[in-house]
């Protein structure tokens, strides 16, 4: 059966921002536990794929990049403190995977890069448990606007665009 154009294909890890979703989200409760587990599980599978798979998939890399972009948006908004540099470590790890893809044809990450990504995934999981659903969706919307601005050519210092 042919899929319809209007079907939601949950391609992004964090979901697609909608004002209605953001307004309907709880101001006091975090995201449902099932949704938190889905996201962190998807990230852990992606991390495992990057570490052990013979040919790591592009979806795993995208999920990890979505997580990094979400965390970077939360830090820019001032809602998350990144004293340990998890965002920069994750950005360096993603660039490491990209350079390995250019050199060897595989999205492989080195050991230190995997440690940086694991720290980012753990921080993301902890934030999902304490951040309200409304704040989560606000960060998603801000992140989408930030990425859209980058694609339009409005880069800030530290922004990196990688195409695979």
PLM feature spans:
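Extracellular/lumenal glycan-associated surfaces
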Residues: 55-76, 107-127
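Short, flexible domain-boundary/linker segments around small modular repeats
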Residues: 20-55, 81-108
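HEAT/armadillo-like alpha-solenoid scaffolds in large eukaryotic assembly and transport factors
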Residues: 78-84, 131-136
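Compositionally biased, intrinsically disordered low-complexity regions used as flexible
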Residues: 1-3, 50, 98, 158
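Short amphipathic alpha-helical heptad-repeat segments
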Residues: 13-17, 32-43, 59-67, 110-116
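Amphipathic alpha-helical binding modules
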Residues: 101-164
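Short Lys/Arg-rich cationic patches that frequently serve as NLS/NoLS or arginine-rich RNA/DNA-binding motifs
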Residues: 1-17
């Amino acid at each position: 059966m042919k899929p319809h154009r209007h079907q939601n294909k949950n391609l992004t890890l964090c979901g697609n921002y909608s004002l209605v979703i953001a307004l309907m989200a709880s101001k006091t409760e975090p995201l449902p536990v099932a949704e938190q587990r889905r996201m962190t599980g998807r990230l852990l599978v992606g991390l495992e794929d990057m570490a052990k798979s013979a040919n790591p998939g592009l979806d795993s890399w995208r999920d990890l990049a979505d997580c990094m972009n979400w965390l970077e948006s939360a830090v820019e908004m001032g809602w998350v403190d990144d004293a340990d540099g998890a965002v920069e470590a994750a950005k360096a790890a993603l660039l490491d995977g990209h350079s390995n893809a250019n050199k060897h044809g595989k999205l492989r990450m080195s050991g230190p890069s995997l440690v940086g990504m694991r720290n980012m995934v753990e921080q993301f999981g902890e934030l999902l448990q304490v951040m309200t659903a409304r704040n989560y969706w606000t960060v998603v919307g801000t992140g989408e606007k930030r990425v859209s601005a980058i694609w339009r050519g409005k880069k800030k210092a530290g922004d990196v665009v990688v195409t695979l």
